Swiss-Prot record:
Single GO molecular function: DNA binding
Organism from which the protein derives: Chlamydomonas reinhardtii
Region annotation I-domain: where it falls in the sequence: 123-254
Descriptive protein name: Flap endonuclease 1
Keyword annotations: DNA damage, DNA repair, DNA replication, Endonuclease, Exonuclease, Hydrolase, Magnesium, Metal-binding, Mitochondrion, Nuclease, Nucleus, Phosphoprotein
Region of interest (N-domain), ranges: 1-105
Length: 396
């Protein structure tokens, strides 16, 4: 579900945290991908005709494999290094949300049958999308596919987005690709949206910078988490009458949900029962994840062409020529991708000490006077500092 209205709130109140970029600008980047969310999207969109999903001759659904194979191939061709992270066991806090989803899916199935009886094609497509359910088999098939493609797979203890955020915070990956904005709430420094969008949609890739978002919103980390909980998340109900704008106002005024509740008029803003905002805050701040140091080394290997043909063509009835062509493009671009980005060959230097800033102004005057006296005859100067890539001798 993500965080209700967070994208718009950031666009209106922290526009500097959003940057549009091009797909190819992520060349050489390691990107953690929320696998479960994207598999669901593939099931909803890829190859759909009315209420019919893409299937093979045996009637087995293949929409998830079609989407996963060709979108992943596109990233690999562009030199992007994806690592797919799959959901583990849902946290206890999410049980109510999952129960609601099951109920909504049942309602959608009932509405779908009525739409079929009425011959309402628009309603048929609408409710069939709402009734989609990703099974363990779909996930396992995608894991098999990715391993055949030479792409690493990570299985999260609980939420994939929390695991992705851990990997991004530690520097194991550049950022995480998802459409759910609660990745920022989990602490991901950089969230990438629309990376998996089909080219036909012509949607620009967006990067969200968490540090800039907090700075422009003028919120601390804890306040940002409380803001997201108030706006609506998977782990806690919402307070009727408090939307995104009012949530931001209240967090800025009271500093926290706890402080807000002490002064809230329950007649005007009824608080649901239960309202596990403290537990939700703790889960966002300290989710159950595998520490990056304990994740096996991420390796991107050459695709197993014959293994992919066996799986996709012989078992799932994919077009063999399309599969082989995609594998050929991946192999052709693998050497280029392995060269990496230019900045990966440079080591960042520590920032210079700032203790001199506290020295008396008299010392500054003496230094300036000395520079003025000897500057004209000194050799080197600014020109001597110019390196191979320009001023400073390095290129970021």
């Amino acid at each position: 579900m993500g965080i209700h209205g967070l994208t718009k709130l950031l666009g209106d109140n922290a526009p500097g945290c959003i940057k549009e970029t091009k797909f190819e600008n992520l060349f050489g980047r390691k990107v953690a991908v929320d696998a479960s969310m994207h598999i669901y999207q593939f099931m909803v969109v890829v190859g759909r005709q009315g209420d019919q999903l893409l299937t093979n001759e045996a009637g087995e659904i293949t929409s998830h494999l079609q989407g996963m194979f060709f979108r992943t191939a596109k990233m690999l061709e562009a030199g992007i290094k994806p690592v797919y992270v799959f959901d583990g066991k849902p946290p206890q806090l999410k049980q109510d949300q999952l129960a609601q989803r099951t109920e909504r899916r049942a309602d959608a199935n009932e509405a779908l049958e009525k739409a079929k009886e009425a011959g309402d094609q628009e309603a048929i497509e609408k409710y069939s999308k709402r009734s989609v359910r990703v099974t363990r088999e779909h996930n396992d098939e995608c894991k098999r596919l990715l391993r055949l493609m030479g792409v690493p797979v990570v299985e999260a203890p609980t939420e994939a987005e929390a695991q992705c955020a851990e990997m991004a915070k530690s520097g194991l990956v550049y950022g995480l690709a998802t459409e759910d904005m609660d990745a920022l709430t989990f602490g991901a420094p950089r969230v990438i949206r629309h990376l998996m969008a089909p080219s036909s949609q012509n949607v620009p890739v967006q990067e969200f910078d968490r540090e800039v978002a907090l700075r422009e919103l003028e919120l601390t980390d804890d306040q940002f988490i409380d803001l997201c909980i108030l706006m609506g998340c998977d782990y806690c109900g919402t307070i009727r009458g408090i939307g995104a704008v009012r949530a931001l106002q209240m967090i800025k005024k009271h500093g926290s949900i706890e402080g807000m509740l002490k002064e809230l008029d329950p007649a005007k803003y009824p608080v649901p029962e239960p309202f596990p905002h403290k537990e939700s805050h703790e889960f966002f701040k300290n989710p159950e994840v595998t520490p990056s140091a304990e994740i096996p080394p991420l390796k991107w290997t050459a695709p197993d062409e014959e293994g992919l043909v066996q799986f996709l063509v012989n078992e799932k009835q994919f077009n063999e020529q399309r599969v082989r062509n995609a594998v050929g493009r991946i192999k052709a671009n693998k050497t280029k991708a392995n060269q990496g980005r230019l900045e990966s060959f440079f080591t960042s230097l520590p920032k210079p000490a700032t203790a001199d800033k506290a020295k008396p102004k008299e010392d500054d005057k003496k230094r300036k006077a000395g520079a003025a006296a000897g500057g004209k005859d000194a050799k080197g100067g600014a020109a001597a500092k110019k390196g191979k890539f320009g001023v400073g001798g390095g290129k970021k």
